[in-house]
Curated annotation (Swiss-Prot):
The lineage of its organism: Bacteria, Pseudomonadati, Pseudomonadota, Alphaproteobacteria, Caulobacterales. This is Regulatory protein FlaEY. The keyword Transcription regulation applies. It comes from the Bacteria. It comes from Caulobacter vibrioides (strain ATCC 19089 / CIP 103742 / CB 15). Keywords: Bacterial flagellum biogenesis, Transcription, Transcription regulation.
């Protein structure tokens, strides 16, 4: 047996903790030295209030911070201890609230009260810490950093494009999709001159059409034309697969490598892709997943996924490589924070715009394309190219809840989205009687973007009760028409008072000379029951509204006469000088009601949309009414709910040219999306039984159908299934020339735009008017930094430098594919504290910037200390808000609060060690010695002694 002197080991640990001889029993043995007075910490006391008492006092409204609750009978105790203990006790109360919220049997009502108390406590603690003055250290509610680098920024300029996987196999395999007479054109514009290069694979002759051979051929063509742009093969090595055989995992070799095509562009060469033969392309979004996997109605445990699928239209040939008519071109699963796609529309350039509702923690993430989701739910505008690549995402930036309900795209590429919002929406132009930021009552909102995806304006208009915008359409002269429903009068509304629950309305907005939204009119209409606008179409000065009024499908025609003026407006030019420039805009408009038409009862159905195609009006939806008031029926209803498409004159009072076709099976079939192109209609929705003779695929299927409205013939249809056997298509959009040989190469049609907006409010969830604060000394004056609509990273960096008195060094850095801000001290003597904005305007999370203290450091006596010679800094890392309403939120809250409490304990130990002269290496220094020994050191020595007793059998 190996033996040793345990007293020697104990002496070592006593020296490590500053306890020897009489000092080990808590009595100073060195009266000639200055006495260090270290009080017992509250977390070491047996007299701490139980958690239930902390919860009760917090819910009763008692203050969280109480310096008087932690007094010591010891004389000479530093005031720092009292302030630290007050902070700790407040955090301990937060911890008790978070723990209580997760206990069994806690009602939703109590959770709500706990949440309110927690939010109050967070605010109180933050205010206390931010104004705290300590002698030996500094506390911050944020982090402690040598530099603060953002995680969210603006996209870097990249001049490359990588397709999705085109083939899985071996490097020298011939690619099936390259067979046949496959060709496309590339137009290259360089220094104002445009040249076209034709890629016709038949020119390869007998050369095998492998990925490498095809790329070599295309590069030869580009080089011969004198261009720098080239192509390369993107190869991803395949991975072994693991399968279960008789309950045991068995590894199998990879099926092959994945091969994609990469376009390596040049900054001075603009590329436009086209094909000699095209066909319509159909884009369908689908929501899939079992809504109740545990079969318990009281739980909300459904996990859903959203997909975007591209089909080539049936009945037309898209040319070789375009895919079989009615064939699937691609199907992609979208980011999990997309809870639902409400509407999709194709643009004139062939791109696909989608309006999506996004929510936090759907798949463990809290962002949409890197942009943090501020509230429980938000609205996102997503733009994809024809190959399914996301070009940009624009989030609304609501801090509470928002829902997207309509989307419109103008011929010039301008985009508008509309819906409902509750809570705060920073940067919006508000109506005169909107609901407050703290209200859960919804208001209508409309946001307009330019062709680059930069927000032009957002308007929020509401009444005293709930309202929402449900339909949009662009008109001439910059007018945007908005339809919706409201439970109370909207500002400036005219028309008969229907006095129903929900009343329908039609409004119009234009951009005034200063670039702000201007309401032109608001017309209300409907019945004494519930009414709502379903869709709007515009034909010159005619506006046709499709609405559901007391269950009836209604059409209303209006004439709009705008007053367009040209006025001189003073604006700031690109050189920073003001100048007077002429601006043409719609100043006023008058609305005249025209014909109305009742299409019949929907009997529980809905109008899915209105379309104008070939000079005729199309109405799509679903109904249980087998006698709709539309003439010229080409097919009969099938029973239950059926889809329908009606075609009629734009003069809605003229019924002579009516055509009606039903689509459905013996069960109930709904229509959730509707599109028309060249006289052909596409319907998507939930499928019932025996729909078009196709058997059920999953538990609850969806469908896609291509219908010839003139004959009623179904040119092509397909049942759709998805995750867990549940799927419902939610939108459909058609591009008249979106399918072509380009699909074989995974390339998008149209001009490949490598540029991205450099505006902060476009690339992030930040809103104009959002803020954060900066100060350069403890308890110093706070300077507010405000985000403007046109701010870039560079202009924001200049603002931060000025706000810090140029004590901050602010530069742009790289984070993945984004450029972000990086803030650091301009000198060793500079300290910058970054704090959240007030009043719900905080922008730090939207920029991925951590609040806290940024300072230079140095190493001194084994410790990392501030380079300016000030005391240590401790960061509590407390966010402005924590969530107790969900399990994930409670788990996060407990983690955050525990981390903050740990920082306070560390701060206590550090100043106690300093007072007792204990260094990091276990030796004693010239600090204060003697005096009362703190309890945490006694506990450490007791633990060491107990360990030695176990080792030696003592």
């Amino acid at each position: 047996m190996i033996t040793f002197d345990s007293s020697a080991l104990l002496s070592y640990y006593q020296a490590r903790t500053g306890l020897t001889g009489a000092g080990a029993s808590g009595v100073s043995a060195s009266p000639s030295r200055s006495k260090a007075v270290v009080p017992n910490a509250p977390w070491l006391s047996n007299t701490s209030p139980p958690a239930s008492d902390l919860v009760r006092t917090a819910l009763a409204g008692r203050k969280f911070i109480d310096e008087g609750a932690n007094t010591s009978s010891l004389k000479g105790v530093s005031a720092d201890y009292k302030k630290l203990f007050a902070t700790y006790q407040a955090l301990n109360t937060l911890s008790a609230l978070a723990t209580r919220a997760g206990e069994k049997g806690v009602t939703d009502g109590e959770v709500s009260r706990l949440q309110t108390a927690l939010s109050k406590g967070l605010g109180e603690i933050s205010g206390y810490v931010q104004n705290l003055s300590l002698d030996q250290m500094r506390l911050t509610t944020g982090a402690v950093m040598t530099s603060d680098k953002g995680t969210v920024g603006v996209p870097k300029a990249t001049y490359s494009y990588t397709t999705d996987t085109l083939y899985t196999g071996q490097f020298d395999d011939e690619i099936p999709r390259f067979k046949g007479n496959v060709s496309f054109d590339i137009s290259v514009k360089s220094f104002g001159v445009t040249s076209t290069v034709t890629m016709d694979l038949s020119e390869m002759g007998a050369t095998p059409r492998t990925m490498s051979n095809v790329v070599s051929y295309m590069n030869g063509k580009m080089k011969a034309a004198g261009f720098n742009t080239d192509f390369s093969v993107q190869r991803t090595v395949g991975q072994e697969r693991t399968v279960q055989v008789n309950g045991k995992p068995v590894k199998l070799p990879a099926t092959g490598d994945d091969f994609a095509l990469r376009v390596n562009g040049d900054s001075v060469e603009q590329l436009t892709f086209s094909a000699p033969t095209t066909a319509p392309a159909v884009y369908v979004t689908t929501r899939a997943g079992d809504p109740d996997p545990d079969k318990k109605a009281e739980t909300d445990d459904g996990v859903f996924e959203t997909t975007l699928t591209k089909y080539s239209a049936a009945g037309t040939a898209g040319g070789p490589g375009a895919g079989a008519p009615g064939g699937k071109v691609f199907s992609e699963t979208l980011q999990g924070t997309i809870s639902s796609v409400r509407k999709s529309v194709t643009g004139a350039d062939g791109s696909v715009y989608m309006l999506a509702d996004v929510s936090t923690a759907v798949d463990g993430k809290t962002d949409i394309n890197g942009q943090p989701i501020k509230g429980e739910s938000d609205v996102a505008l997503l733009k994809y190219d024809s190959a399914g690549h996301l070009l940009y995402a624009r989030s609304l930036g609501a801090t509470d809840n928002a829902s997207g309900l309509s989307l419109a795209v103008a011929s010039d590429g301008s985009v508008a989205v509309a819906g409902s919002v509750s809570g705060r929406l920073q940067g919006a132009v508000n109506g005169p009687i909107n609901n407050s930021d703290s209200s859960s009552t919804t208001d209508s909102f409309v946001t307009r973007y330019d062709a680059k995806g930069d927000e032009q304006w957002t308007v929020r208009r509401g009444g005293l009760q709930e309202d929402e915008a449900t339909a949009l359409a662009f008109g001439s002269n910059g007018v945007l028409y908005v339809g919706g429903r409201s439970k109370s009068d909207l500002p400036g509304s005219v028309g008969t008072d229907p006095s129903g629950g929900w009343d329908a309305y039609l409004s119009a907005f234009a951009t005034d000379g200063n670039g702000q939204p201007k309401a032109l009119f608001t017309q209300k209409f409907g019945t004494a029951e519930n009414d709502s606008v379903s869709d709007i179409v515009v034909n010159g000065s005619q506006v046709i509204v499709g609405s559901k009024e007391n269950g009836q499908a209604m059409l209303r025609s209006f004439e709009v006469t705008p007053s367009v003026v040209t006025e001189n407006v003073t604006k700031l030019n690109q050189y920073g000088a003001y100048e007077s420039v002429p601006v043409t805009y719609t100043k006023t408009a008058t609305l005249t009601a025209g014909a109305t038409r009742d299409l019949g009862s929907l009997k529980g159905g809905e109008i899915a949309g209105l379309k104008i195609d070939g000079g005729q009006l199309y109405v799509g939806g679903y109904t249980a009414n087998n006698l709709m008031s539309i003439g010229g029926a080409t097919t009969a209803p099938s029973g239950g709910m059926d889809g329908f498409v009606g075609r009629m004159s734009l003069d809605i009072s003229d019924t002579t040219g009516d055509t009606l076709t039903y689509y459905g099976g013996t069960g109930d079939d709904t229509v959730t999306g509707f599109a028309v192109s060249n006289g052909t209609a596409w319907l998507v929705g939930a499928a019932g039984k025996n729909l078009d003779g196709e058997e059920t695929v999953g538990t609850k299927d969806g469908y896609v159908a291509q219908v010839n409205v003139g004959t009623g013939a179904v040119d092509w249809s397909q049942r759709v299934t998805g995750k867990d056997g549940y799927a419902t298509p939610t939108s459909v959009a058609v591009s008249s020339s979106g399918a072509s040989a380009l699909d074989a190469f995974g390339l998008p049609g149209g001009t490949m735009d490598f540029s991205q907006s450099n505006r902060i409010v476009s690339a992030t969830a930040a809103r104009a008017g959002d803020t954060f604060q900066i100060r350069t000394r403890e308890r110093g004056a706070l300077t507010t930094v405000t985000i403007d609509a046109n701010d870039t990273l560079e202009t924001l960096a200049d603002k931060i430098k000025r706000a810090s008195g140029f004590r901050a060094k602010v530069e742009t850095a790289t984070n993945g594919n984004s450029r972000v801000l990086k803030i650091s001290p301009a000198s060793n003597n500079a300290t910058i504290e970054i704090m959240p904005g007030k009043g719900g305007t905080d922008v730090l999370r939207s920029l991925g910037i951590a609040g806290g203290v940024v300072r230079a450091t140095k190493t001194e006596d084994g410790k990392t200390v501030s380079a300016d010679g000030s005391g240590p800094v401790y960061g509590l890392q407390l966010p402005p808000e924590l969530d107790l309403t969900t399990e994930a939120g409670r788990k996060n809250a407990n983690m955050v609060i525990t981390r903050a409490m740990s920082q306070v304990r560390t701060a206590y130990r550090e100043i106690a060690d300093t007072a007792l002269g204990i260094k990091n290496d276990g030796t004693t220094g010239s600090g204060k010695t003697g005096g009362t020994v703190p309890a945490y050191l006694k506990n450490q020595v007791a633990n060491y002694q107990a360990a030695l007793n176990r080792l030696t059998g003592g």
